[in-house]
């Protein structure tokens, strides 16, 4: 399969971003699914950048870090620090939220996870960014994301 990701893959920076927080619950991807992704990434020389703002996102980070000790938190109070860290990353997996759109705007390769939102209105515009769209976020099986990650040279 050709998902159109950048050909240089992740070898240049070895960091991936998990953008998980959203202003609406129905746009959030289930924690257990994120854990499956983090567990899959345990076998690779990758750091997982987890943006954190508030207690819920801090708890999310702690759960991911239990599964994959390479996960690190990025405080999101300072936009310049966010951009500086995102510039060190090669790839993102994110729900429909502002930080995911920032990743996309910075030109990172990645996967947008869409539930109730219409990606044709707010989705990515670059060929190296892909969308998984289901009516409910719980319908996005982590195995589909893992399949796409394999195309990004994770295996």
What do these predicted ranges mean?
Residues 26-27, 57, 138:
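Alpha-helix N-cap/loop-to-helix initiation residues
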Residues 16, 46-48, 132, 145:
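Hydrophobic beta-strand residues in large extracellular and virion-surface proteins
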Residues 20, 50-52, 134:
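Short glycine-centered, acidic/aromatic-flanked micro-motifs in structured strand/loop junctions
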Residues 8-13, 43, 147-155:
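Short, Lys/Arg-enriched, disordered terminal segments
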Residues 33-111, 115-119:
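Donor-binding and catalytic core of enzymes assembling or modifying cell-surface/extracellular glycoconjugates
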Residues 1-27, 31:
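Mid-sequence helix-capping/hinge segment at a functional interface
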Residues 101-155:
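Nucleotide-sugar donor-binding patch of glycosyltransferase catalytic domains
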């Amino acid at each position: 399969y050709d998902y159109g990701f950048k050909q240089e893959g992740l070898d240049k920076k070895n960091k991936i971003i998990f953008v998980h927080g959203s202003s609406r619950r129905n746009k959030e991807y289930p924690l257990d699914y994120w854990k499956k992704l983090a567990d899959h990434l345990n076998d690779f020389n990758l750091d997982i950048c987890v943006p954190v703002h508030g207690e819920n996102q801090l708890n999310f980070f702690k759960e991911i870090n239990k599964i994959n000790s390479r996960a690190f938190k990025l405080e999101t109070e300072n936009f310049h620090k966010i951009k500086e860290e995102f510039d060190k990353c090669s790839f993102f997996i994110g729900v429909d939220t502002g930080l995911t759109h920032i990743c996309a705007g910075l030109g990172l390769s990645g996967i947008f996870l869409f539930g109730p939102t219409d990606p044709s209105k707010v989705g990515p515009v670059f060929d190296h960014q892909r969308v998984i769209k289901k009516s409910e976020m719980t319908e996005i099986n982590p195995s589909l994301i893992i399949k796409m990650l394999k195309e990004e040279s994770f295996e």
